[in-house]
């Protein structure tokens, strides 16, 4: 067997020049291949190099995946947003006719595995650094943070594609002695969904003892690990709702609380607030928050246009507080089949335009509702309703009651739709609760007509195709059903 010199690694990065991005060329950039480089067992030798590896993990929040795709995937594939813009790759995705050569799909695969590789560098090599200024305690903390982040990225990947390769070693150089090991890295097989979730849980549970304190809102903290664990146990095949309750019990001891003013979550003046569990810290530097320009503004047709459905949901509920914080209407120079140019809606949760916009990876209201979902599944309808009503009381809405499992799931889904609109959650909520095909196949326009593309959704479309470019390069990868 001969290993081609030009092997394309699974670990790919992507480059983006924000200043040159327009709605027509969004997502059309090609990834940059990370080539093999010789590495010893001690490629990093100083505390400064170790801290640089950690900085790289967090600076990934400036990447296109986090600044744009995460929100597009979670809302434009659901009933809270239309695709917006004019990019055909986006239209495929938002209309449930995605194909294996879609560049959004390949870029997100490359980005997620690139992020995982950044985590693996810390996990593989930080223990070998002998610099005395890098303490044993700091090494443990670094590894805990990297483990939480790796788990988060595998959690995203397994929800998007199902079975995915499990790679736990950083890219290494190729030589005759390590050929078989490198071959398995370069040409990995897909692990089962159960195996992926096992690694995710192991990473998160193993990180709890050494993770930064939950008061560190901008780091992968103990609270972040608890929050992700709760979501993982609610989402994995054969969910463990007792575990969800247990981890949200622990989360409740970490000092989090709901902000009394909903808009303070998004106004830029209350960063690292009491409700924030894990917050990406836009700083106009290493994390330049450019997503705002993709979602709001009248200079060109933006992405993630709020849907008639979500605006109607706010109106029907009398939810003026969250509607005003979530959606803003402007006069624009264009019109489409959904909205008139005189009152065109934009997402309003990301509204800071100086590069310092933050966003939430996890916040407490989200986890209260995940806990409520678990309570419903366990038959505690009164306890579930009490949790939902905490969230509703914050915005002046009357309490609900829950009478059955289906009633509870439907009411919690509606509450999550209103509370977490445009935060990248809806697609995954619908999948997790088994409601995606039922709800998305009946999506309607502002006149009550079922959207022409709604019939495209089916069970196969709930997972993305494995990127064709990866299959072409890797004989061990198989395609998802229906692609």
Task: List each language-model region with its residue ranges.
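Flexible, polar/acidic helix-loop-strand segments at domain edges
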Residues: 97, 170, 312-363
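Short, solvent-exposed loop/beta-turn-alpha elements that line the ligand-binding surface or hinge
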Residues: 80, 85-108, 128, 176-188, ...
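TPR-repeat structural position
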Residues: 197, 239-241, 381
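Conserved, well-structured interaction surfaces
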Residues: 46-55, 59-60, 87-161, 186-195, ...
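Short, surface-exposed recognition loops and adjoining beta-strand edges that mediate ligand/DNA contacts
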Residues: 67-90, 164-175, 212-294, 399-407, ...
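Membrane-proximal, proline-rich intrinsically disordered regions
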Residues: 3, 23-72, 453-483
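Sec-dependent bacterial lipoprotein signal peptides
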Residues: 1-21
């Amino acid at each position: 067997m001969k290993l081609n010199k030009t092997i394309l690694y699974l670990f790919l990065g992507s480059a983006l020049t924000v200043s040159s991005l327009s709605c027509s060329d969004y997502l059309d950039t090609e990834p940059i291949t990370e080539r093999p480089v010789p590495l010893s067992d001690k490629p990093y030798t100083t505390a400064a190099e170790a801290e640089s590896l950690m900085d790289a993990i967090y600076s990934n929040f400036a990447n296109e995946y986090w600044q744009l795709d995460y929100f597009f995937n979670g809302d434009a594939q659901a009933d809270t947003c239309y695709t917006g813009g004019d990019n055909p790759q986006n239209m495929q995705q938002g209309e449930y006719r995605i194909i294996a050569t879609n560049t959004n799909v390949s870029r997100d695969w490359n980005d997620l595995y690139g992020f995982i590789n950044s985590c693996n560098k810390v996990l593989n090599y930080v223990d070998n650094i002998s610099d005395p200024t890098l303490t044993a305690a700091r090494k443990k903390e670094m590894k805990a943070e990297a483990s939480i982040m790796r788990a988060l990225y595998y959690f995203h990947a397994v929800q998007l594609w199902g079975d995915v390769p499990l790679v736990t070693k950083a890219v290494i150089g190729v030589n005759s002695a390590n050929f078989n090991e490198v071959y398995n890295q370069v040409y990995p097989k897909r692990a089962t969904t159960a195996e992926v979730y096992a690694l995710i849980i192991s990473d998160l549970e193993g990180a709890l003892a050494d993770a930064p304190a939950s008061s560190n809102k901008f780091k992968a903290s103990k609270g972040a690990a608890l929050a992700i664990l709760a979501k993982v146990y609610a989402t994995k095949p054969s969910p463990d709702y007792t575990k969800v309750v247990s981890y949200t019990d622990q989360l409740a001891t970490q000092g989090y609380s709901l902000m009394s003013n909903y808009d303070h979550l998004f106004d830029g003046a209350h960063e690292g607030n009491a409700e924030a569990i894990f917050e990406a810290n836009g700083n106009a530097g290493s994390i330049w928050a450019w997503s705002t320009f993709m979602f709001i503004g009248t200079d060109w047709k933006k992405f993630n246009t709020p849907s008639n459905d979500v605006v109607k949901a706010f109106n029907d509920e009398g939810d003026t507080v969250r509607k005003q914080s979530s959606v803003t209407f402007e006069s624009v120079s264009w019109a489409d089949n959904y909205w008139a140019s005189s009152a065109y809606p934009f997402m309003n949760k990301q509204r800071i335009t100086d590069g310092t916009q933050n966003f939430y990876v996890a916040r407490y209201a989200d986890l209260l509702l995940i806990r409520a979902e678990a309570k419903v599944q366990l038959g505690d309808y009164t306890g579930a309703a009490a949790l939902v009503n905490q969230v509703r009381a914050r915005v002046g809405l009357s309490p609900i009651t829950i009478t059955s499992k289906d009633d509870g799931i439907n009411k919690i889904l509606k509450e999550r739709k209103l509370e977490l609109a445009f935060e990248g959650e809806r697609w995954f909520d619908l999948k997790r609760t088994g409601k995606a095909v039922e709800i998305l196949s009946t999506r309607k326009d502002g006149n009550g007509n079922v959207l022409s593309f709604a019939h495209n959704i089916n069970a196969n479309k709930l997972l993305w195709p494995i990127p064709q470019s990866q299959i072409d390069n890797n004989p061990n990868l198989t395609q998802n059903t229906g692609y």
